[in-house]
Curated annotation (Swiss-Prot):
Its main location: plastid. One of its GO terms (biological process) is photosynthesis. The light-harvesting complex (LHC) functions as a light receptor, it captures and delivers excitation energy to photosystems with which it is closely associated. The LHC complex consists of chlorophyll a-b binding proteins. It comes from Spinacia oleracea. GO terms for cellular component: chloroplast thylakoid membrane; photosystem I; photosystem II. Belongs to the light-harvesting chlorophyll a/b-binding (LHC) protein family. The modification N2-acetylarginine is found at residue 1. This is Chlorophyll a-b binding protein. It is found in: Plastid, Chloroplast thylakoid membrane. Keywords: Acetylation, Chlorophyll, Chloroplast, Chromophore, Magnesium, Membrane, Metal-binding, Phosphoprotein, Photosynthesis, Photosystem I, Photosystem II, Plastid, Thylakoid.
Length: 9
């Protein structure tokens, strides 16, 4: 699942 932490951009 996707980790919701730091933005990829």
């Amino acid at each position: 699942r996707k980790s919701a932490g730091k933005p990829k951009n």
